[in-house]
Amino acid sequence: MISEVKQDAKSRMEKSLSVYLSDIDGIRTGRARTSVLNGIVVETYGGRVKLNTISSVSVSDNKTLMIKVWDSNNIGAIKTAIMNSNLGFGISCEATTIRLTVPDMTQDMRKNLVKLLGKISEDCRVSIRNIRRDIMDRLKVMQDSKEISEDDLRVAGVEIQKITDDIMKKVNDAFTSKEKELLHV
């Protein structure tokens, strides 16, 4: 019974961590990275599709991304979607290839991105603490209904806290790493 609750806690916290890591991976750092375009949705074929389903994206060099469009009719829609994303890329087209030039980041841009990173990180921490509180509430209800003893509750609480601390350490490590990457000129 308690092991199921602990497994649920770990699973939910790891999902929060996974979402957090994908969110911060999308923050651009002044270097060309294909993950920056993961969230781009293109209006084409009478609907909305992700950019990577209608093209292939690769890194040409440190400052350039190359998008190979599979259907040349989609070039206009892709350019529009990229411009609307406000990523600040320079865009040039040649036949079925779109080149995106990553502009140099100013110190203000870097500071703003660090603030955004801090907000995303804190949201993740809050989410993890809420999961811990929810799990502890579930354990207390189990103790109140005599499904587990007070000692079991205390031991489970310590184990849940250890899981929480491990996940929080991963969040903090990812934050520190990304912050260094952002501030590196």
From Swiss-Prot:
Subcellular locations according to the entry: Cytoplasm
GO molecular function: ribosomal large subunit binding
GO BP annotations listed: translational termination
Pfam families: RRF
A GO CC annotation given for this chain: cytoplasm
Alphabetically ordered keywords of this record: Cytoplasm, Protein biosynthesis
Keyword Transport: no
Chief location bin: cytoplasm
Similarity comment: family membership: Belongs to the RRF family.
Function: Responsible for the release of ribosomes from messenger RNA at the termination of protein biosynthesis. May increase the efficiency of translation by recycling ribosomes from one round of translation to another.
Name assigned to this protein: Ribosome-recycling factor
Organism: Ehrlichia chaffeensis (strain ATCC CRL-10679 / Arkansas)
Lineage of origin: Bacteria, Pseudomonadati, Pseudomonadota, Alphaproteobacteria, Rickettsiales
